[in-house]
UniProtKB/Swiss-Prot annotation:
Known role: Skin-specific kinase that plays a key role in glycerol metabolism, catalyzing its phosphorylation to produce sn-glycerol 3-phosphate. Involved in skin-specific regulation of sterol regulatory element-binding protein (SREBP) processing and lipid biosynthesis.
Primary gene name: GK5
Transmembrane segments: none
GO MF entries: ATP binding; glycerol kinase activity
Identification of the protein by name: Glycerol kinase 5
Reactions accelerated catalytically: glycerol + ATP = sn-glycerol 3-phosphate + ADP + H(+)
Gene3D superfamilies per record: 3.30.420.40
Record keywords: ATP-binding, Cytoplasm, Glycerol metabolism, Kinase, Nucleotide-binding, Transferase
Organism this protein belongs to: Gallus gallus
Annotated compartments: Cytoplasm
Enzyme class: transferase
Amino acid sequence: MPCGQPGSGAAPALYVVGVDVGSTTVKCHVYDRAAGVRGSSCRKVESLYPRPGWVELDPEVLWSQFVGVIKEAVQAAGLHMRQVAALGISTQRSTFITWHKRTGKPFHNFISWQDLRSAELVNSWNRSLLLKVIHVIFTVLHFFTGNDRYLAPSVLTFSTQQTSMKLSWVFKNIPEADEAAKKNNCCFGTVDTWLLYRLTKGSVFATDYSNASSTGVFEPFTKCWNPTLCHLLSIPMSIYPPVKDTSFNFGSADSEIFGVPVPIMALVADQQSAMFGECCFQPGDVKLTMGTGGFWNVNTGGNLFASHKGLYPLIGWKIGEEVVYLTEGSMSNIGTTIKWAQDINLFTNVDETAKMARSIVDSQGVCFVPGFQVSANDPYLCASFMGLKPTTTRNHLVRAILESVAFRNKQLFDIIVKKVRIPLQTVRADGGVSNNSFVMQMTSDLINKKIEKPSNTDMSSLGAAFLAGLASGLWTDKEQLKKLRQIETVFEPQKDEKEYKPAMDTWMRAVKCSLHW
């Protein structure tokens, strides 16, 4: 029944709304009990670049887009908001904002996880004597106790993607935020917390375990905000929100927003949400998301593996007494790179890139190094093409870009195999770049694993909907969710990974040349 028609409120609430607030788009899907998409809406995220290396989002614009896509998707489904049983919200991680506790006024725009303003601070800390002392102390503690809780700080390094350093920057550079914090009047929130705060007109201030653990300020072993780290960085503990279950009744959206009070039944970080949407419920289940960034996640069950170079532990989700841990390896600028290649007219439509790459035997020695974080965690990595020749064509450039994605996938997968002591199952892929058959097949060849791609690659939206649906009773358990999964394509290894070794060795040399630019 179309939105707003008389009598539409009489229909039972049998639908769940899943919203994914990503780095490039805000998407909303309305799902029925069979997990079928009944209506959708999408808007482009408008990133701001006020200075070189800075990436921000206007909170009012993001709020307007968020509310807009929900209303549009429900209308597209021909439904009334009264028929929505639950709202689940998946959000990009580590993008944050601070605001005044009494007035609700932000002290600054959202600072994106892609923002590099803390690069100098990160480098200074990573080279500091204090951090070296911390490494020694916790290495000794781990040696004598065998407690893995001490392993993470023994190898602690800071990254520009983490919230911690950028939050420290805020209190050093925005006097209003610092003064409010000293008076216990400052609130910190990732995107989920801010949206919840706005939806409830300021009555609910909270986050969930998946979002909290992704900030780099939350201790996954103790499941609390890290007081030692906050003391080191002079960040007041009073700013942080309470942490709730991922699938949980967070309250209802104020009726002024959607016309009726819509139950908010899940908050979840986007990669953990995609993991849940892919039904990676068992230890050893592997999820590969290739969107704006690339993320490998392994379900490690109740085992929390400490950080290793290139990998870090996260809380996947908490539902009641169940806490599921993940190990993650990430790379940034996958989708961003492909969009850039389109903007400079290397191709017209992204769908043609796989065909372009296959039209030639190889990249003719051309290598592309995106400006993503490699194993050295170098924020000054230079994006570059290398090996260009007079015979180089657009096809060679496009193939080099796609190959770089597959090579980085191989690097991260090898680290996971080495460090995660759990037998790995079939890989499940999602995200926009998973629609590229060249990248998918090459990745399958390189890691020698079968990769499944679902019919709908918007797994973050589906995961948020699944979590909200469980909390509202629309679905009863995870076994029921598994039966709703639909696989569109399965990629199986077709070439021996050794055939790619010369090309990958050349690419790795190109990466080394681009470090510390």
